Regions:
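Membrane-embedded beta-strand positions of outer-membrane beta-barrel proteins
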Residues: 12-14, 27-29, 145, 240-242, ...
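Transmembrane beta-strands of outer-membrane beta-barrel pores
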Residues: 16-18, 31-37, 138-140, 149-153, ...
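Conserved small-residue
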Residues: 3-6, 10, 19-123, 245
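Transmembrane beta-barrel architecture of outer-membrane proteins
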Residues: 7-11, 24, 127-131, 213-220, ...
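Repeated loop/turn-to-beta-strand initiation elements of outer-membrane beta-barrel proteins
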Residues: 10, 22-23, 140-143, 228-229
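Extracytoplasmic gating/loop element in the C-terminal half of outer-membrane beta-barrel translocons
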Residues: 150-245
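Outer-membrane beta-barrel and related beta-rich outer-membrane complex signature
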Residues: 26, 36-52, 152-180, 250-259
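C-terminal beta-signal and terminal closure region of outer-membrane beta-barrel proteins
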Residues: 1-7, 49-76, 176-177, 188, ...
Length: 289
């Protein structure tokens, strides 16, 4: 039996057109919601793991499955209190944590941070998608703009995670001011660097971010030259225009672009150095003879 998936949602479309004297204008709003549920994974599998995601029966496709964290250890008192309900010290990779280490949640309270402590942390699927198109005309001028966005989804910033491994001599991402590792800035929330040791760079919710965004996808303004100016040139119509794409994005995501494509459906919410959408401005003319 193959994968069986059920998608549910609704779509709402609202449009408006009007004219006041020489001014024409219109608007079109589309809102879409979608939720999916895995009904069968085939071959009686209870789940499928892929990278930072796990797909399970009766859950969404490619749900994030990660270690949950509670900041980093900044005082010795926090380390001393890092114990099970029975008072047993909690070990990370068989060792007690030190100042600047990540504080992982011991989900099963067995005193050992292992893969069994991972938890479901959110869905890569947006709860709502929206697009808004506005257009207007006044005499020989025309204007249009399109916004789109999605809201309520999570993104795992693999690019940031890979840039924090410090397990070899590879190149790594530069730290922003105020986000330096613990050895440099003890007031930041970035854990200490341990060369050759990845305990502070496990697949954790530290790299899980809000993927919501609202973007000005396209904006255009044009002007049609008057026909009497063109008749001696043998031109029926000449329109000058300027257009821009992806000029403005509102988002809290720290990666290059929250609007990316991951072709691996089992890990669709992970951004691994995805190429961003191009920001562009163009000028042109349309000629009709």
């Amino acid at each position: 039996m193959r994968l069986s998936l059920r998608n549910r949602g609704f779509e709402l479309s609202l449009g408006w057109k009007d004219q006041v004297s020489d001014f024409k204008y219109g608007a079109l709003l589309n809102i879409t919601t979608l939720s999916n549920k895995v009904l069968s994974l085939g071959y009686e599998k209870p789940f499928i793991d892929s990278g930072q995601a796990r797909t399970r029966l009766n859950g969404p496709l490619a749900e994030f499955f990660l270690y949950k964290t509670d900041g980093i250890f900044k005082t010795q008192e926090q380390i001393d209190n890092y114990v099970t309900p029975d008072g047993e010290p909690i070990m990370i990779s068989g060792k007690r944590p030190q100042l600047g280490d990540v504080k992982y949640i011991d989900t099963d309270n067995n005193g050992q941070i292992t893969a069994d402590d991972r938890q479901f942390c959110g869905s890569p699927w947006a709860k709502m998608q929206m697009s808004l198109v506005l257009n207007a005309e006044w005499k020989d001028f025309d204007f249009s703009m399109m916004w789109n966005g999605q809201f309520g989804n999570k993104i795992y910033n693999v690019s940031k995670w890979q840039g924090r491994l410090f397990s070899d001599n590879s190149n790594y991402l530069r730290f922003k001011k105020g986000e330096e590792p613990y050895q440099v800035n003890q007031n930041s929330d970035t854990p200490r660097i341990i060369y050759g040791d990845q305990r502070n760079s496990w697949d954790a919710d530290r790299f899980l971010e809000n993927g919501s965004y609202f973007r000005l996808k396209n904006i255009s303004i044009g002007y049609n030259l008057k026909k009497e100016w063109l008749k001696n040139l043998g031109i029926d119509k000449l329109r000058l225009y300027a257009t821009g794409s992806n000029l403005l994005t509102f988002t809290g995501y720290s990666g290059l672009d929250p609007d990316f494509i991951n072709t691996n459906i089992w890990n669709s919410g992970t951004d691994s150095f995805s190429y961003p959408n191009t920001r562009s401005v163009m000028f042109g003319l349309d000629l009709t003879f």
